[in-house]
Amino acid sequence: MKELQTVLKNHFAIEFADKKLLETAFTHTSYANEHRLLKISHNERLEFLGDAVLQLLISEYLYKKYPKKPEGDLSKLRAMIVREESLAGFARDCQFDQFIKLGKGEEKSGGRNRDTILGDAFEAFLGALLLDKDVAKVKEFIYQVMIPKVEAGEFEMITDYKTHLQELLQVNGDVAIRYQVISETGPAHDKVFDVEVLVEGKSIGQGQGRSKKLAEQEAAKNAVEKGLDSCI
């Protein structure tokens, strides 16, 4: 953790008072499970907190930055900024991938490069930073790491397939769209989800992902790429 502390201090002017909290933010469930006797905490609760503060601060930024954008457009842009792949990219930019504590099995299976794990660690770090400092420090970090890419327009071209599919299907009126998990495979800390999207009870696309959200996006993408004529 000393190397991580050095990175945080040199690049972001961040020094944690509670070093244990920082360590927890970078501890994956697989590592904690392999060291149960040591009663090591993992980062899921901090991820929950970090997700909430991230949503708040990005929402505030977008609201002030784009005073003429409607709510729907703001929601889409926020979703692109805080999606798993985006957060994993920010984690790599900060070198966070080097410091995550993983179980041996997770390490061997390529967990250090997995977007789900990296995105979760990024959110957990934000949660830890909030507890150790305050929301102003979290905002400062986000504005240093994330906002420059937002202002460069890197997220405006990413397709939100769920929203795109909904817009295509509901052009002539409301249509019942539902996403359903077909199967879950793998250990608890590394599940793979298979999801199908149904319109009026009919399956129109399937997708797979390391989280339900990713699998739903893939299912929607599959439906869009098939073409609506084959969907309804």
UniProtKB/Swiss-Prot annotation:
Role: Digests double-stranded RNA. Involved in the processing of primary rRNA transcript to yield the immediate precursors to the large and small rRNAs (23S and 16S). Processes some mRNAs, and tRNAs when they are encoded in the rRNA operon. Processes pre-crRNA and tracrRNA of type II CRISPR loci if present in the organism.
Swiss-Prot/TrEMBL keywords: Cytoplasm, Endonuclease, Hydrolase, Magnesium, Metal-binding, mRNA processing, Nuclease, RNA-binding, rRNA processing, rRNA-binding, tRNA processing
Cellular compartment(s): Cytoplasm
GO cellular component: cytoplasm
Gene, per the UniProt record: rnc
Binding, Mg(2+): 47, 120, 123
Molecular-function annotations in GO: double-stranded RNA binding; metal ion binding; ribonuclease III activity; rRNA binding
UniProt cofactor(s): Mg(2+)
Matches recorded under CDD domains: DSRM_RNAse_III_family, RIBOc
Annotated EC: 3.1.26.3
InterPro entries xref list: dsRBD_dom, RNase_III, RNase_III_dom, RNase_III_sf
HAMAP family: RNase_III (MF_00104)
Protein name: Ribonuclease 3
Record-linked PANTHER family: RIBONUCLEASE 3, RIBONUCLEASE III
Catalytic activity line of the entry: Endonucleolytic cleavage to 5'-phosphomonoester
Keyword hit for Cell inner membrane: no
Residues annotated as domain RNase III: 5-134
Subunit composition and interactions: Homodimer.
Alphabetical list of Pfam families matching this protein: dsrm, Ribonucleas_3_3
